[in-house]
Amino acid sequence: MNQPIGIADSSRPKTNVRLTISANNLMDLDVFSKSDPICLIYEKTSGRKATTTEEITVPTWKDKQWTERGRTEVVMNNLNPQFTKTFLLPYFFEETQLLRFEIYDADSPTVGQDLSSHDFLGRFECVLAQIVSYSTLKAHLGKTGQIGAQWRNKDKNTKTGSITIYAEEDEKAEKIQFDVCGEGLDKKDFFGKSDPYLNFKRKFDDGSTHLIHRTEVKPKTLDPRWATVQINTQTLCAKDGDRPIIIECYDHDKWKKGEEPRGDAKFSRDDLIGTAQTTLNELLRGSSDAVEILLTNEKKKAKKGDKYKCSGTLKIWNSRIVIEPTFLDFISGGTQLDFAVAVDFTASNGPPKSSSSLHFMSADRPNQYELALRSVLSICQHYNSSKTFEAFGFGAKLPNQSSVSAIFPLDLQRGTSEVVGITGVMTAYRHALSNVQLYGPTNFAPIIENVARKAQNMIHDSARYQILLIITDGIISDMHATIRSIISASGLPLSIIIIGVGNEDFEKMHELDSDDALLQQDSRIAQRDIVQFVTMREFLNNGQGLYLDPDVIQENLAREVLYEVPAQLTGYMKQRGFQPRPVDDPWRRDSPPPEFDPILDGTGRRAPMLQAPPAGFQYPVYADTSIASAPPMY
């Protein structure tokens, strides 16, 4: 979880992105011929990963915070080069991957690490998320000391020229899909039929095996038909058609109510019915006619000898290779991530002016709420071209109001939940903090239901997907209603991230993050897992009592809370049968409002405080927002 920055954890979802680069109207610095351009790409691997607002004084090739990721060939005598060499980079949705593209006029066909003898032509700095969001990104090159700027409609060429970056997934995830059933399986239960399921295992060269896929359990049958199976061929057999694949058939033994362990432990006492070995090529022969595979139980075979035939038969049919749309397919097709945030203003946070309060505003260090907000927003902003967010507060009394608001717009100045950019969210938060009375209780259901109503309007296509971030310091007061709301929203284009701040015991909150089993209440079961919960305190220090740098905290926190989002989005789209729009005909991308400043928004600097709302100002009313007053609990 707290791995070194820039080192990829093999367990995290990763996609390789291939970048192709061209440039136009470059400066001509040669006297008797045109420039001979070469493009180098760098990634910032240490220090703060935010776009700089100051002039760059140290050449990137000398700056130890930047690591070269590759370089193109030199294109001789050309001001409009189309470089043939491409860059292959790992892409992580949950990370800020800050890149620099720098073009030099090479003074020789061979360019070494020292670039001091080569003329600088231009630079563009951006995060990888910007590139993959547009698929094709064009930008003005910046002069020496500048970082350039993204090309806008109606822009004209500048003296430094422009760069165009094309991004595409290097390789699509290939899966084998097939139907499978069993016939005549051995009976393992004394008083009833077996409860069979299948394990598909990869076999490695050293003979060891690893579980790749498990089917559902089919109760009380010796002739089961399981749901259609889909398995990644790279994971199953490294796409090797002749590599052995192990299939195991087990009879599941039920546990007594309240005794069933979590995770794979609940399969620990199951009885083996039989095993078989096959290959990808053999499975694919089931594309036309059914493939029959005999299950063998070695213990039973040794006991019965020649009388033993098999322990049942597996039949596989409708086999085919499928390539499913990926997260980047949807993003490149214009799918936008709408983002909403809800901040806990209950009294248990402590008086904001007290240094022990979780809302305390220090002059030199952001509080935990600010860290959580910036951590998630700094990633998600690149997937919403409008640069606007919805921001709410909950559990406070607003100015001139007697009742407690279970949900209110964070921007008290304008009385609206819509704010522009990260700066707008942070400014609205600080302003609200100085104008509301912290109260209680901690109710999540009104927030979830409000955002779910918005997500309900997104169900007709793949254009938008909603993410809700809730930051809280305590135990939920309306757990039953919250679970009901989450289950009701589980079929919507919605992911919910909950970050617990402070030192409260959040054990019950883990019930909402149903990684082992889908969330259930009475007879209702969630359609999918849409909640990710983490506690902030796990990220604040290095394990030796020393607080980490805020930038490191934000990076590690974002990595943990956001990595499930791509799978949740693609899982929803698959469930609804939605396909991504073509890259050359994407969903419409809204432009940010005129007041949005991308440079200021990326710095993290504190914006000026908003003024208090005028006397008699009426705040908007949301459904079911007023709750019974409870005394503050500091």
From Swiss-Prot:
A Pfam family of this chain: Copine
Domain of life: Eukaryota
Binding site for Ca(2+) 4: D189, D251, D253, D271
Binding residue positions for Ca(2+) 3: D189, D195, D251, D253
Reported cofactor(s): Ca(2+)
UniProt function note: Exhibits calcium-dependent phospholipid binding properties. May function in membrane trafficking. Regulates synaptic levels of nicotinic acetylcholine receptor subunit lev-1 and unc-38 in the nerve cord. Involved in nicotinic acetylcholine receptor (nAChR)-mediated sensitivity to nicotine and levamisole. Affects directional sperm motility.
Membrane topology note: Peripheral membrane protein
Gene Ontology BP annotations: cellular response to calcium ion; receptor localization to synapse
Xref: SUPFAM superfamilies: C2 domain (Calcium/lipid-binding domain, CaLB), vWA-like
Expression by tissue: Expressed in head and tail neurons, ventral cord moto-neurons, body wall muscles and hypodermal cells of the vulva.
Keyword check for Calcium: yes
Phenotype of null mutants: Sperm directional motility defects. RNAi-mediated knockdown causes a moderate resistance to nicotine-induced paralysis and a decrease in unc-38 synaptic expression along nerve cords without affecting lev-1 cellular expression levels in muscles.
Gene Ontology MF, one: metal ion binding
Subcellular location: Cell membrane
Residues that hold Ca(2+) 1 according to the record: D30, D36, D105, D107
Spans annotated as Disordered: 576-603
VWFA domain segment(s): 338-557
Classification via InterPro entries: C2_dom, C2_domain_sf, C2B_Copine, Copine, Copine_C, VWF_A, vWFA_dom_sf
UniProt name for this protein: Nicotinic receptor-associated protein 1
Comment on protein domains: C2 domains are necessary for calcium-dependent cell membrane association. C2 domains are necessary for neuronal progenitor cell differentiation in a calcium-independent manner.
Domain C2: start-end pairs: 1-141, 159-295
Family, as annotated: Belongs to the copine family.
Keywords for this protein: Calcium, Cell membrane, Membrane, Metal-binding, Repeat
Basic and acidic residues compositional bias, start-end: 582-592
Primary subcellular site in the record, as a coarse category: membrane
